[in-house]
């Protein structure tokens, strides 16, 4: 088993004893295209103790250390390159590679006593870093992607010092140690001091110590400024001490004034309490009486509310019924309109049906007549045709007989007969033509007659329609006139209703206007009565003075100051609080005031304070001055309104430049601001700041009412009360008239609305009739055109008639010509023939002629019947078509008529129901009107009684108010005295506190408090005289009261500055303590490490040099950090020298001794050194090599060396060589070779 391999678990080997804790070591290094290493090259495995990397110069030995630096996260410049991408291998055979990577395999082991070791299971791990062409790189731990932070954290956790890199000694670093200065010369330099502090770890205190040092300097500067401020405050305090003493004298005088005020107020308070007791009894009796009246009033109000509720209930019910009745009317009107419309529609339909029935009957009759006539003609024609042969046969027989007769008279008649036969033969065509023309004449005459009758019938229908249109137009005009009249009436009645409602609304508005006036008038009467009674019971002092004024007993009296001015209600509380002089009596001269005082004294009426105007003339110029107030707040004086301009003097004397603030915050700012002229400030809520700085107000209800919003009248006369009562009476009469006017207007518009309702129903009915007439008129107008067209023969018919007339005329002329042409010949010959045969022949001829005539008639009749049949067939066809159309129209109208009957029935039923509802509603309204009238009467009567009770109660209340006012005045006076006593006591207490606070002379204070005059009994007058005397004395004094506050402020400022100085001093001391503690901790830790390292350095140097000496020395022994550390060395058999003055080899030995001492002070599991023996001779290399060999027992050393007496001591040799510009590696275990060499021996 090899020495560097872990101990196996075989049973044949004895159990090994562990000799240490786990430590980290580098097992193997794998490089891929890194610097001079092409492809994947494995360097190692390294020995757990001492591995030497050997190889010729330029082969790539130092790249092994660069590979480790690369994995440990060092930048390219630390590996003698500019960019990371330059780490990628680049040689002739390996160009344009994408990346370079290095993997370092670590493992934790536990050293055993016999040189073997045991691997800690699961402790191995591999760190890899790969560099790319884009100068980026990536980290991996066990092939898992990682980052620089995680890598460094893991290595630090295993004991590798990556912060100071003391485990790495690169090529040339040993010599750099010898070149170090005792201390860094700049922020980026490193000297021996910084080098040692990095190892010892005291450099962590440097930044904090520097920061505390800066804080300490800042605090010292701040403290110097505060010291100057304290001295300045002390000087200002001493300057104010004299003014303070003067103010203290004034304050003692003011203390005495407060005591006398307290005594006078107490006496006035006791007198007021006695008067209050007397007034309370009188008020109690009057309130009891008023309470009884209020009980009655409450009962009456309750009853009135009930009556009002009942009245309102009935009124609402009446409105509901009226609305229902109005709705019924509207519905009934609508049904009436529908009824009229349906009646007219039904009438119109019936007329149409009747006309159609008449037409059908007439046309049916015509068809019947024509059919019968055609049948008769059809039946007659066969008979006539049958008679003709018979008559012809008879004619032949008769002609034979005639021939026989003629034969007898043949001779005579032969000539005539021959001529007649000849004539007959000539006339036979004529006869035939005559028969034809007669037939044509008969046909044309019949057709002409039929056409004429048709035109006459159509003309008659057209004339009848025109007449109906005329009648309808007349009726429409009549209805339109009636409608216009009704509309005018409706408009008139509606206007009357509107005017009545307008009168009602205007009257109600007047009533609404007058009701408050009535109430105000009643209150005014009660107020005047109360004021008159109040004046009778006015304050006896003021009353006596005003009486003297009215009687001209004393001249120059104006009255109570509060009654001589007015102010907005907003400032009532403010002026009532801030102006104590509102109860003063204003007089013109001193003599007037003395006269008043004498009057009160003689009557033993009490005391009063007077404002003498002639004493206030020095304020006149101030009245005209324009002042600029702080924050533009108003002065109370400017807000007061007066009738007499002279009264402004009095108000200015009482108020001065007192200003009004909107709230306490603003008042505080102004009162304690820089403008002393406006130090007296009152807030709207009554908080008052005096010039002395004291504040009063708050804690209870704000006092107000000492000045009105209008200037009060001097008195109330009986005449004024009578005038107010007359005014009230007029308003009451006007109200009664207006209420009567409202009632009349209501009755008037209701009557007008009822008439409008009836007229609207008639108007609707008339409008429906007009609509029906319009409909019938429109129908007739539409028919009239067709009737007119029918009455006007058609062009073809006219042409036909003309043609028929021509035919008739022509045929008549032809017949006449034919008859004329044959008649003479026939008649002459016939006469001759007849005369020739005698009478017998004549008779026979007549008979023959008659038969011939009958035959001719039959032929004519047959022709006429045929024409008649043909004409009748045409007319029957036309009439049949008209009957069919008329029948269909009649059926439609019958359906419409039936629908109208159904709708009419429904309308009638609904209208009946509405009418019944209307009747019931009207009945309910009539019944309810009586109830409403009764309820209204009861309500108004009771309201009148309640109003009278209210007026009586108001009078009583005003009396109570007057008495209460007087009582309240006494109470207010009592409270005022009480409050004043409390205020005086508070002021006294505050004054005492202020005096004690200001350290006033105790003997003077005791003498003031024990004044014999204060303790002696006296009357109120004596006390007031003392108060007045002290006030006068105080006025004569003119101390700067602000000086006390300023002195106190300066004392407080001085104390505050002292406190601030103490605070700053304490903060500085705390910072200095922290600063000193950190410096001491740094010094102690540094010296402890320094001494340890120095001793180890001495030991290491003696061991390496075999007799030399070396030590670290402080340039400044008192402060090692001020000048730094020097490295002194005494080589063997030489004197002490600074390391910088040694030879190259001596510098290397000294530096290595220091490095080894530092390693001993802070050991790490790994040490990597690059040619540390380069400058040493053979002997010293051997000494260093054996020391390293000894140190590798508990640490891993990887040393690059070219000295055989160094690398021959190594446990493993890693050979580095280069071929084809590519570095390769081979690892050799020297121990194995040694075994092989021993085996043959």
From Swiss-Prot:
One of its GO terms (biological process) is mitotic sister chromatid segregation. The modification N-acetylmethionine is found at residue 1. Residues 1-22 are annotated as: Disordered. The keyword Transferase does not apply. It comes from the Eukaryota. Residues 555-671 form the SMC hinge domain. Keywords: Acetylation, ATP-binding, Cell cycle, Cell division, Coiled coil, DNA condensation, Meiosis, Mitosis, Nucleotide-binding, Nucleus. The SMC hinge domain, which separates the large intramolecular coiled coil regions, allows the heterodimerization with a SMC2 subfamily member, forming a V-shaped heterodimer. This is Structural maintenance of chromosomes protein 4. It comes from Arabidopsis thaliana (Mouse-ear cress). The lineage of its organism: Eukaryota, Viridiplantae, Streptophyta, Embryophyta, Tracheophyta. The gene is SMC4.
């Amino acid at each position: 088993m090899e020495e560097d391999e872990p101990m196996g678990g075989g049973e044949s080997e004895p159990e090994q004893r562990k000799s240490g804790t786990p430590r980290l070591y580098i097992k193997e290094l794998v490089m891929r295209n890194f610097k001079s290493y092409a492809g994947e090259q494995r360097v190692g495995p390294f020995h757990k103790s001492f591995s030497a990397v050997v190889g010729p110069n330029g082969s790539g030995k130092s790249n092994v250390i660069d590979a480790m630096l690369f994995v440990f996260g060092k930048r390219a410049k630390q590996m003698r390159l500019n960019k990371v991408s330059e780490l990628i291998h680049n040689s002739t055979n390996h160009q344009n590679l994408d990346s370079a990577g290095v993997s370092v395999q670590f493992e934790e082991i536990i050293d055993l006593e016999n040189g073997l070791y045991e691997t800690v299971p699961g402790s191995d791990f591999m760190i890899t870093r790969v560099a790319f062409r884009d100068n980026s790189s990536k980290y991996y731990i066990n092939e898992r992607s990682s980052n620089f932070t995680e890598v460094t954290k893991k290595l630090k956790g295993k004991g590798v010092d990556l912060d100071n890199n003391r485990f790495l000694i690169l090529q040339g670093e040993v010599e750099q140690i010898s070149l170090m200065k005792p201390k860094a010369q700049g922020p980026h330099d490193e000297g021996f001091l910084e080098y040692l502090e990095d190892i010892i770890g005291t450099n962590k205190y440097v930044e904090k110590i520097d920061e505390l040092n800066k804080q300490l300097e800042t605090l010292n500067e701040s403290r110097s400024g505060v010291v100057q401020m304290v001295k300045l405050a002390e000087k200002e305090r001493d300057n104010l001490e004299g003014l303070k003493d003067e103010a203290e004298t004034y304050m003692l005088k003011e203390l005495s004034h407060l005591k006398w005020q307290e005594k006078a107020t107490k006496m006035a308070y006791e007198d007021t309490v006695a008067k209050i007791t007397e007034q309370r009894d009188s008020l109690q009796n009057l309130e009891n009486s008023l309470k009884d009246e209020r009980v009655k009033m409450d009962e009456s109000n309750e009853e009135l509310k009930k009556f009002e509720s009942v009245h309102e209930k009935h009124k609402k019910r009446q409105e509901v019924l009226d609305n229902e009745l109005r709705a019924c009317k509207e519905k009934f009107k609508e049904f009436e309109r529908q009824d009229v419309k349906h009646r007219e529609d039904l009438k119109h339909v019936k007329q149409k049906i009747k006309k159609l029935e008449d037409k059908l009957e007439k046309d049916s009759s015509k068809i019947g007549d024509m059919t019968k006539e055609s049948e008769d003609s059809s039946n007659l024609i066969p008979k006539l045709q049958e008679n003709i042969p018979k008559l012809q046969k008879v004619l032949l027989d008769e002609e034979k007989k005639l021939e026989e007769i003629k034969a007898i008279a043949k001779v005579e008649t032969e000539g005539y007969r021959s001529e007649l036969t000849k004539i007959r033969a000539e006339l036979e065509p004529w006869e035939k033509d005559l028969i034809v023309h007669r037939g044509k004449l008969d046909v044309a005459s019949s057709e002409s007659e039929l056409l004429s009758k048709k035109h006459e019938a159509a003309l008659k229908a057209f004339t009848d329609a025109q007449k109906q249109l005329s009648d309808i137009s007349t009726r429409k005009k009549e209805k339109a006139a009636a409608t216009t009249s009704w509309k005018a009436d409706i408009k008139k009645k509606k206007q009357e209703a509107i005017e009545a409602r307008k009168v009602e609304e205007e009257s109600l508005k007047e009533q609404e206007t007058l009701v408050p006036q009535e109430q105000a008038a009643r209150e005014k009467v009660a107020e005047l009565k109360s004021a008159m009674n109040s004046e009778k019971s006015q304050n006896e002092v003021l009353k006596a003075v005003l009486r003297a004024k009215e009687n001209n007993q004393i001249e120059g009296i104006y009255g109570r100051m509060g009654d001589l001015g007015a102010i907005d209600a907003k400032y009532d509380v403010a002026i009532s609080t801030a102006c104590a002089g509102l109860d003063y009596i204003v007089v013109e001269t001193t003599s007037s005031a003395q006269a008043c005082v004498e009057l009160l004294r003689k009557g033993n009426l009490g005391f009063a304070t007077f404002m003498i105007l002639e004493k206030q003339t020095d304020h006149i110029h101030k009245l005209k001055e324009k002042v600029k107030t702080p924050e533009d707040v108003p002065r109370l004086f400017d807000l007061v309104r007066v009738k007499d301009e002279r009264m402004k003097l009095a108000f200015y004397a009482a108020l001065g430049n007192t200003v009004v603030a909107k709230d306490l915050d603003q008042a505080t700012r102004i009162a304690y601001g820089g403008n002393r002229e406006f130090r007296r400030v009152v807030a709207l809520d009554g908080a008052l700041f005096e010039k002395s700085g004291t504040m009063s107000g708050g804690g209870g209800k704000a006092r107000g009412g000492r000045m009105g919003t209008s200037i009060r009248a001097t008195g109330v006369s009986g005449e004024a009360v009578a005038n107010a009562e007359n005014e009230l009476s007029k308003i009451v009469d006007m109200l009664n008239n207006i209420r009567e006017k409202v009632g009349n207007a209501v009755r008037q518009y209701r009557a007008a609305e009822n008439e409008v309702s009836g007229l609207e129903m008639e108007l609707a009915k008339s409008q429906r009739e007009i609509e029906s007439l319009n409909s019938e008129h429109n129908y007739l107008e539409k028919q009239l055109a067709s009737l007119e067209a029918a009455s006007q023969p058609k062009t073809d018919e006219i042409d036909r008639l003309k043609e028929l007339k021509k035919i008739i005329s022509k045929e008549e002329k032809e017949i006449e010509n034919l008859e004329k042409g044959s008649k003479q010949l026939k008649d002459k010959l016939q006469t001759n023939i007849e005369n020739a045969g005698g009478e017998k022949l004549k008779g026979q001829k007549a008979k023959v002629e008659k038969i011939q005539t009958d035959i001719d008639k039959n032929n004519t009749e047959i022709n006429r019947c045929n024409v008649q049949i043909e004409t009748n067939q045409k007319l029957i066809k036309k009439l049949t078509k008209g009957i069919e159309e008329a029948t269909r129209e009649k059926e439609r109208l019958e359906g419409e008529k039936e629908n109208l009957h159904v709708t009419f029935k429904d309308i009638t039923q609904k209208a009946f129901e509405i009418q019944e509802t209307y009747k019931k509603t009207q009945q309910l309204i009539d019944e309810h009107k009586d109830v409403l009238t009764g309820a209204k009467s009861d309500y108004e009567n009771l309201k009148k009684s309640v109003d009278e009770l209210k007026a009586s109660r108001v009078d009583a209340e005003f009396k109570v108010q007057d008495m209460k006012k007087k009582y309240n005045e006494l109470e207010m006076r009592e409270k005022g005295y009480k409050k004043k006593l409390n205020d005086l006591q508070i002021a006294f207490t505050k004054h005492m506190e202020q005096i004690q606070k200001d350290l006033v002379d105790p003997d003077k204070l005791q003498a003031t408090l024990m004044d014999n005059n204060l303790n002696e009994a006296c009357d109120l007058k004596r006390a007031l005289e003392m108060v007045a005397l002290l006030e006068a004395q105080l006025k004569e004094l003119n101390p700067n009261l602000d000086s006390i506050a300023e002195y106190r402020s300066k004392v407080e400022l001085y104390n505050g500055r002292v406190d601030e100085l103490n605070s700053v001093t304490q903060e500085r001391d705390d910072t200095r303590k922290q600063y000193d503690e950190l410096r001491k901790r740094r010094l102690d830790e540094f010296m402890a490490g320094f001494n340890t390292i120095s001793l180890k350095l001495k030991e290491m140097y003696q061991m390496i040099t075999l007799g030399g000496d070396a030590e670290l020395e402080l340039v400044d022994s008192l402060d090692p950090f001020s000048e730094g550390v020097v490295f002194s060395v005494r080589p063997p058999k030489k004197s002490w020298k600074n390391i910088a003055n040694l030879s190259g080899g001596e510098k290397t030995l000294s530096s290595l001794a220091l490095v080894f001492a530092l390693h001993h002070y802070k050991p790490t599991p790994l040490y990597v050194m690059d040619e540390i023996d380069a400058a040493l001779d053979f002997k010293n290399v051997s000494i260093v090599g054996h020391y390293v060999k000894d140190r590798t027992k508990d640490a891993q050393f990887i040393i690059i060396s070219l000295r055989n007496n160094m690398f021959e001591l190594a446990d493993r040799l890693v050979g580095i060589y280069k071929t084809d510009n590519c570095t390769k590696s081979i690892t050799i275990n020297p121990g194995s070779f040694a075994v092989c060499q021993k085996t043959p021996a």
